[in-house]
Structures are given as C-alpha cells and as structure tokens.
Amino acid sequence: TSARGQLDLVKMYYGQLDKEGFIIDERFNGGGQLADRFLELMTRPVIYNLYWRHGKGTTVPSKTNTGPMGMLINGWAGSGGDGLPWAFREMNAGPIVGERTIGILVGPATGHQLIDGGGITVPGARLYYNNGNWFDEGVGVKPDFAVWDDPNLIIQGRDPQMEKVVKEVMDLLKTKPGVATPPPAKEDRTAKGLNKKNN
C-alpha cells in the first residue's frame, strides 16, 4: 500500500480489466498508506452503459470490473497490509485466504528524526470499525479460509494459498459472475418509429 504499490496497482489492474475475476495478492505487504484508493478503484460499480454507433458498448465509469474478487494474506503483511484486507472485509468484497496478518495497524503516523541518526514514528490516530469497535491491534486480520503456506508444497512449485483462493473465486464466478448488461433491442428512432412508440 505504498506509493509504489499504488502505481503497480493501476498498471496491473487496468491491464487486466477484461478478466472475469480478480485475486489480490497482498502477502508481504509491509504497509504504507490506507487502502481507500485501492478498494475504490477495484469495487467501482457500473452506473450506466453507452452503446456507440459503431456497435461497441462501454460502461460508465469506463474502467470497471464487477467480477468476483478474492484476497491472499499472510503473517508478513502489516500496517497498511492489515488495513487493506480489513477494508476488503468491511466492504464484503470477497473471500480472504491465507494466514493472519501481523496486526500492527494503528493509524497515520508522523516520523521524527533522533539526534543519533535513528528515528521514530508516532501515530496520531487509531482506526475503528463502523460498528464502534477498535481495530484489533496485535491480532491482525484473520482469513476466511486459513491455509498454511506449507514449505513442502512450495519446494514442489505449488502455492497452496493461491490454489485455495483461485478455487473460491472460480466458484463465485458460477454463482455471482460480473455484471455485463447487453444493449436493449434496437429501436426505430425515425419520426415514424417514435410516433408509434408514443401512441
């Protein structure tokens, strides 16, 4: 969720808008900023559609994908890496798979330089849920499906967490596919056709 991560998101997300679903791999996300920009971009609804004279349709906003999503998390994700899956769950955006995040999300922090060259950060705020409870600092975000990153499988070239989230998103594609509204039947927009419609 750093500035670099936001640039990568835009590049990778827009490059794959034609896919039927998405998997957000936020394992090892060391943080940076809160995830509102990420989630606003990935969960934009289609407000209406345009059908152009040349026969192509577009959505408005034009950069949307309403297919199902899933997220991967692990114990190396913290701070903004806690915030992204936390917000993903708050928005009911899709299943979360993997291992619990670190739980070091406190809030926006300011940095202070020390005279020995070191530094400290001091959070000026703390996050809490819409239900009025504090974010579970020290606990982190627990996955919907706990899957251990088994090193025995990894050395075989497998990724058990990825395999599980792919299965979950593929299952969602069968029950909750993305919204793709076809254009209505063409109308006779001549004066004669419009008169018939209005009578």
PLM segments and residue spans:
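Gram-negative outer-membrane assembly/targeting C-terminal domains
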Residues: 171-199
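C-terminal or mid-to-C-terminal helical accessory/interaction module adjacent to the motor/catalytic core
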Residues: 146-153
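Cleft-lining beta-strand/loop regions that shape enzyme active-site pockets
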Residues: 1-118, 153-161, 167-175, 199
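Juxtamembrane/interface motifs at transmembrane-helix termini
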Residues: 142, 156-158, 183-186
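Hydrophobic transmembrane signal anchors and adjacent membrane-proximal interface regions, especially
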Residues: 8-11, 15, 136, 162, ...
